[in-house]
């Protein structure tokens, strides 16, 4: 398994070395992108949003890290505010720390690794997916809430 991962990473070696991430950090972020992106084509966008949050020392704000931290396998389960605020080195929805969790939460595939090495250059800091998995990016929290409200009005909100 480690040999296969080394083979996968070798094609990105030079670009990983130029990035702001260690291999461990890159795999950690790619593991989150793997679970957060509604469609494979959206992975670069999701990685771009997370990259912006990390660069600006924000909390990563990824729900899938909360599910992982709390050992909840059902992503349709509605997390409570108490669960979202739980301090844990994996829970990036809490305000206990900013940036990446301490390690990967899944085994990222090549597409998620590639998206993390080459994230979309975006000004967005927020994203949400509709019921069909289409991802919508927003630059501000107000825009993000407007997208969510629109999806709810259209019965296309599946959170």
For the regions a language model picked out, list residue spans one by one:
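Bacterial extracytoplasmic/cell-wall-associated proteins, especially those involved in peptidoglycan
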Residues: 1-159
């Amino acid at each position: 398994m480690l040999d296969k991962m080394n083979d996968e990473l070798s094609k990105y070696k030079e670009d990983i070395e130029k990035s702001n991430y260690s291999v461990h950090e890159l795999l950690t972020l790619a593991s989150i992108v793997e679970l957060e992106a509604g469609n494979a084509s959206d992975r670069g966008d999701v990685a771009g949003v997370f990259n912006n949050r990390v660069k600006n020392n924000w909390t990563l704000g990824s729900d899938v890290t909360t599910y992982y931290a709390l050992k909840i396998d059902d992503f349709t389960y509605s997390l409570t505010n108490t669960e979202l605020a739980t301090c844990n080195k994996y829970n990036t929805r809490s305000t206990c720390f900013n940036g990446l969790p301490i390690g990967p939460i899944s085994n990222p595939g090549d597409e998620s690794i590639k998206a993390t090495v080459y994230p979309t250059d975006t000004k967005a800091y927020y994203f949400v997916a509709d019921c069909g998995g289409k991802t919508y990016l927003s630059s501000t929290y107000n825009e993000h809430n407007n997208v969510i409200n629109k999806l709810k009005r259209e019965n296309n909100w599946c959170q």
